[in-house]
């Protein structure tokens, strides 16, 4: 037995630390080493819950007043997992890189090569684990399990959005975590299927493209962006969300994900600064009793590309960290758009929301405010 394996074994098994600490979709160095305050104990523990994989989904029946949530990861799992790790940009970290940055958090038996994937695929699996708390809370609130799909899964099975996927769904959550270099784009048939979905009364489309870092070809500007967010696991260029951009273009959603901005912290608590919420515009009450989302060091600014204030409503903005310069703040900005709403219009009976996917991926490290936001989405229409 290798000494490394022996050391891991003697640490003891117990409950995996991923059940007790924050583990967000883009695993940042800071998140690996800290746990949000007021963490809420989970009511369902992963190790005690049956987990399915590679199964045909049984459609959920409609229940009045109880929403059926679906998560759709826009990536090609094989293409992301098989990226050349000698490439510096536009790829996910390997699990080995995560372990190095987060040491010694992942030096436990459950993270060894005997039990967990060590390459990029291991990091992708962290993302899947990171939605379990959200699934539990929403499932308890609605009485329906949250279904999780991938555009192209581990087995290479392609699942475009169509009437079958959307048919048993009331709230469709599009998690835009595909690197643009992998060329995932919504087809005309998918766009039409989503448009048809939104003609159904009571539907909601949540679009969550992640950050777009390093757009400029100027190395100095890329370095400024990197120094601003300060996460060693994020390369100097990491551009996400071609699929969501193509979907939004097809649906006429005048919004674009830009930058990767570090939220400001409250000097009193060192936690993420409170949202600037436009509560008078929040007609559905999604932000009722919600003061903050969760801290993530590189969040997108959702730039509105139309002057029509009735078409898109900015419901919340996040103060940005001013301690390190960034092109966004140098242009005079102090807050970035973080939660947007397109109310029903014309033949579209459903709502369209925009919020970064990491808001839904805190694994057993959420706060009361975040739990209330999730519950509001599940129960308010």
Segments from the language model and where they lie:
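N-terminal export signals
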Residues: 5-24
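Short, surface-exposed patches at the edges or C-terminal ends of soluble domains, predominantly
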Residues: 27-381
